Amino acid sequence: MRAGSHLEKAEPTARETSWYEWAGVARYAAKFLSTREEVTKFGAIGLRTGGEVVFKIAPYVPLGCMISVCAAGWLAYRGREKFTGEKQVFDEEHHRFIAGLDSQSYAPYVNCPVLLLSAVNDSKHDYDRVFDTFQQINPAVQKAFLYSSHGNGLIGSHSIADIDLFLDKYLKDMSVFVSDTVDLAVEEDEKGDLVAKVTFDKDAELKECGIFFTEQLSDAHARDWTRVLGSRADVRENVATIPLSIYEKSSRALVYAFANYSNNFSVTSKIQEVVIAKPYRNASLKSRIIYSAERDSLNGVSGFRRRARSIASCFADSKGVDAKLLPGYGGLLGATAEAGLVSYRVNEPRYAAPEEASLRLDAYCKEDAHLKIVFYFDGNEEKAYSAEVWIEGGGKWKSFCFDASDFKSQTGEHIDSFENAVSLVFIGDKEVLINNVLWI
């Protein structure tokens, strides 16, 4: 039997939902473990739906710790984005679900250490609201939070390191430093620049820090998160001041901060909405250059999630998922990924296609290859408009130029313009390097 609407509605009560049964089974398993003489301590890790179940049993069973991966409630808000400003109106069944079953309602009663892991651009959970649940967790317990920032909705290596260290501390009783969360404030400095002030754990040795930001508030799973690393000069004591260069015509932006410490434990802040109230000195101009390896490194591209290998549709196979830079002809770098490259910059105001624009790009491959270029105009990336080119192996970089009419769907429809594109994907049948993607 399928759970259907019972996953986000309590019809007629919580007892009639699948959650009630799943939580009952999990509580029974915990009770069984607690009666075993050889078990001195146990915890719970839940992936996606399993993470929601863990929240529902944590207040009632003696867990040593809990880890929730890509799950922290707000299921009744499915399809209702946080930052659109729309008023949320619910029927009685949804209200009952929020009060009796949604994980954020259980968070204040959790009494064991908690690690929450989330992934930006994930379409299967509400990552915008995960930190709202984190803030509601019982303040008396140790807790930590981390966004995985691949841009393809999958959990990466920093999160896996956090899992290992968290379990070492709370199940194996090892001496492991677990950091407090990162605090973030966005303000104007004395020069008239917009900056992010990031406050880190003063008791920790910082290894790396920075911010991620996007100017796209809607289409939560199709955002381009630009990373800005903090330099040593940016850090004073436990506060880093990092420049935040927002597109001059953007009225709002989303920002979060991250820190990686010397023991490899990482944490992030909440996603903070920033209202751009005035023009700032360091505002950015409109850019026709969507991606340049020299300028962007790996900002602006990531592994394409639709083709990415993963474990439980949750943990990334980093070798096949992550974008990487490799040298092509003349030592010039280009981006590639086994899963294919995706860029959500075409969905960002700063990089969106001008009227009647054409697309130009450079590509290189050591051997003969085919390259498919795909545009999606829907957030679910279901209907593809594609064009294909053949790349002769070796030699110099090859330049290609496309008009909108060159891109066709499987039924032969073509697009009239690149305006309102959500994502741009590059898929090669060999290791094809991409560089200098721009509108002309």
Put a short name on every predicted segment.
Residues 28-90:
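Primarily recognizes the serine-hydrolase "nucleophile elbow" in alpha/beta-hydrolase
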Residues 334-412, 428-433, 438-439:
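Extracellular ligand-binding interfaces
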Residues 110, 116-118:
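Short beta-strand/loop motif that positions the catalytic acidic residue
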